[in-house]
Amino acid sequence: TKENLNFSGAIYAGGLDSGISEKITLTLKNLTQDMFKSKGGIYGGSKGSTEGALVKDGDIEINISNSHIYADILGGGGAFGKSSKVKAKNTKITVSNTSISGYENNKNTWTGRIFGAGLVQGGALFEQESTDVVINNVDGVTYDQNNGEVSNKVGVRIYGGGQNYKAVEDKSQLKIGSTKVTINGKDTALAEVYGGSIISGTGNK
């Protein structure tokens, strides 16, 4: 039930070091801010966590509505194990009438984010055929980590692709075939929108 839901880490709609060959569907609605104990990630696909893992997902569909979420939303899964490979086919994300929030700390801002694809790091490979992100009346705020108060109504960041989080000497690879982003709604508030992906971390040069 709603009263028993609490999220303190990542949510994966897929498997652990094992993919789902048929379609994955994740539906979230009427979630509230107090269900999230810390800022995490909501992944539509599977997680590759061990060295050399090979994970293959089919199509992925994510539907989120009427919610207040303190997390990043990622259409694909996550590839973390060294030399692991996580692959997915086509992702469709629809987010409606929802707030996706982040936090601020020492003048650094991490907004809530929507990624059409997944996340890769630690020398892994993430590959996806296509993404399709549709938003309707989506906004977001940031919270001051020191006092928990709203510090900025900056909006949400949207990436049609995924995230390659690199450390120094990290050879992680992120490959996305095509992306599509559609923005609707008079109440939508956006910090930034990118059709592609982001490379971040200490090894992002």
Where does each model-flagged region fall?
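Surface-exposed loop/turn motifs in large extracellular/passenger domains
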Residues: 1-72, 78-194, 198-205
